């Protein structure tokens, strides 16, 4: 009898204690800061646009987003850091097409990840329109005149790009194939080197990113002959398809990724926040004033762009000997 009373008493005490202890429930995502890895140096166009997007996402998510810059190796260092991060949604990346597409086309053994298997696409944010530019005093007033001259004078027109295997190099090769014109490719090491060479008269044409050239266009020093994507500030500058050619030229893009395997809840929250932030009208104006084009694409659309860009670049690389068949 005493044992029964004792057992009952212990049960009641334990039950009472269980009621007094608050139950630990899973908190909704996110409940702590998120890291955003940008695969470029502070102050670069991609860094600025990524930070602006992060600020808007903070308002939507109600949590801090800590930006970490990891530049180097054509964007693959920062991208690899995302791949190797914990698969919990608290580390995401903002790489360019370079680290996702072009680095593995040119030098696949140096890329330690497979974007198709190791990364979860969250959405494409923007495009950096690529251009064909000449000095304002150049004899060619439009792209057609440049092509006609290059056809009549094979190899005489020097075209600068930021290096072999860059998107601009691939655009040059596509342009030659489409038009039948023959240019001389002059690869540089990136940065402002192509623009400097154009202004100095060391090359006749620059295939590069628009944003660097806009101040010189406004100053009357540079003329843009071709865009890979239409820009409202340059309504009279055509894309190559507007000139009747059947294939578009690719543009540099910036997108957001997480490591593959993050929880579905985290993915859903991040994708929704990215889309809402990217489509914010005030943010869009800020970023487009830098010469870029905000054109949000869903994860599925981003996946399609990745595949198409890679297959096209790989085909060209094999054709011109940058990659073994």
Identify the role of each PLM range.
Residues 298-324:
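Extracellular/periplasmic bilobal clamshell ligand-binding domains
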Residues 57, 81-90, 105-193, 240, ...:
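Hinge/capping helix and adjacent helix->loop/strand transition within the periplasmic-binding protein
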Residues 268, 284-304:
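Mature extracytoplasmic/periplasmic domains
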Residues 13-23:
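C-terminal segment of classical bacterial N-terminal signal peptides
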Residues 26-118, 156, 164, 177-209, ...:
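N-terminal (or domain-start) structured segment
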């Amino acid at each position: 009898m005493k044992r029964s009373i004792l057992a009952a008493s212990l049960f009641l005490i334990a039950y009472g204690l269980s009621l007094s202890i608050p139950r630990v429930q899973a908190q909704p995502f996110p409940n702590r800061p998120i890291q955003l890895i940008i695969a470029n140096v502070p102050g670069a166009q991609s860094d600025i646009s990524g930070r602006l997007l992060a600020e808007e996402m903070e308002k939507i998510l109600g949590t801090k987003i800590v930006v970490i810059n990891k530049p180097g190796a054509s964007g693959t260092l920062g991208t690899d850091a995302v791949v190797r991060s914990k698969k919990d949604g608290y580390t995401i990346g903002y790489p360019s097409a370079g680290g996702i597409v072009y680095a593995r086309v040119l030098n696949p053994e140096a890329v330690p990840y497979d974007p198709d298997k190791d990364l979860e696409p969250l959405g494409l944010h923007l495009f950096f329109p690529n251009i064909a530019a000449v000095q304002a005093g150049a004899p060619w007033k439009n792209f057609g005149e440049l092509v006609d001259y290059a056809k009549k004078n094979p190899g005489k027109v020097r075209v600068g790009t930021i290096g072999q295997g860059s998107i601009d190099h691939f655009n040059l090769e596509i342009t030659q194939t489409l038009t039948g014109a023959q240019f001389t490719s002059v690869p540089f090491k990136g940065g402002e080197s192509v623009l400097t060479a154009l202004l100095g008269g060391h090359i006749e044409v620059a295939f590069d990113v628009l944003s660097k050239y806009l101040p010189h266009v406004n100053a009357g020093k540079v003329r843009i002959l071709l865009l890979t994507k239409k820009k409202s500030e340059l309504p009279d500058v055509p894309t190559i398809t507007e000139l009747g050619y059947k294939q578009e030229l690719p543009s540099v893009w910036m997108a957001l990724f997480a490591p593959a395997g993050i929880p579905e809840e985290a993915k859903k929250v991040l994708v929704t926040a990215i889309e809402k932030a990217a489509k914010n009208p005030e943010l869009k104006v800020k970023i487009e004033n830098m010469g870029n084009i905000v054109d949000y694409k869903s994860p599925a659309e981003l996946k399609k762009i990745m595949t198409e860009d890679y297959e096209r670049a790989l085909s060209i690389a094999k054709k011109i000997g940058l990659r073994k068949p």
